[in-house]
């Protein structure tokens, strides 16, 4: 089951949990209200035939999908890619990920610019809105396999912070003010 919490400010190994003392957890409804990040639980034993996933793909027009495996054995330029994934950035399109195997962390900024860490495992699907600053890292198991979904041709272009003048960032900030 997915968990989310506010992170400490430690610069220790990014693959650790980084809980505050005491821990400050946040549930998925509150995460959505504060950030626009959506969470869905998909049947981890048969995710591609999951009714919820099929419905989401149709409603949101996800027309392209692929898989990514992040491990030292499977990902070319592993260390460089992980460094890029963990650099704070945003995208012009929403980022949709369904975890098939393994686990990892998506970190997103809240309205006060604090980090919220989202721990994802098989069956967890998250949708990170366009324009939100975020990053990704593996946990201490160093392995994740995930489906990626796109509308049309896949575009995965990170725009590193600062990117506050980008239209997608301005649109995101507007939604943040009005509420998701």
Swiss-Prot record:
GO terms for molecular function: acireductone dioxygenase (Ni2+-requiring) activity; acireductone dioxygenase [iron(II)-requiring] activity; iron ion binding; nickel cation binding. It is an enzyme of class 1 (oxidoreductase). Pathway: Amino-acid biosynthesis; L-methionine biosynthesis via salvage pathway; L-methionine from S-methyl-5-thio-alpha-D-ribose 1-phosphate: step 5/6. Its EC number is 1.13.11.54, 1.13.11.53. The keyword Nucleus applies. Belongs to the acireductone dioxygenase (ARD) family. GO terms for biological process: L-methionine salvage from methylthioadenosine. It comes from Pediculus humanus subsp. corporis. Disulfide bonds: none annotated. Pfam families: ARD. This is Acireductone dioxygenase.
């Amino acid at each position: 089951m997915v968990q989310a919490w506010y992170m400490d400010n430690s610069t220790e190994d990014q693959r650790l949990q980084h809980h505050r003392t005491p821990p400050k957890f946040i549930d998925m409804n509150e995460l959505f209200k504060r950030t626009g990040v959506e969470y869905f639980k998909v049947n981890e034993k048969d995710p591609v035939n999951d009714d919820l996933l099929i419905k989401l793909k149709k409603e949101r027009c996800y027309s392209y999908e692929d898989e990514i495996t992040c491990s030292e054995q499977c990902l070319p330029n592993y260390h460089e890619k992980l460094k890029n994934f963990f650099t704070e950035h945003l995208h012009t399109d929403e980022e949709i990920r369904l975890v098939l195997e393994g686990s990892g962390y998506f970190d997103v900024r809240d309205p006060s610019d604090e980090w919220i860490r989202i721990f994802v495992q098989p069956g967890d699907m998250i949708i990170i809105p366009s324009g939100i600053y975020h990053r990704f890292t593996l946990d201490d198991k160093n392995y994740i396999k995930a489906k990626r979904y796109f509308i049309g041709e896949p575009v995965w272009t990170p725009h590193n912070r600062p990117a506050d003048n980008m239209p997608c960032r301005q649109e995101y900030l507007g939604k943040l003010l009005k509420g998701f």
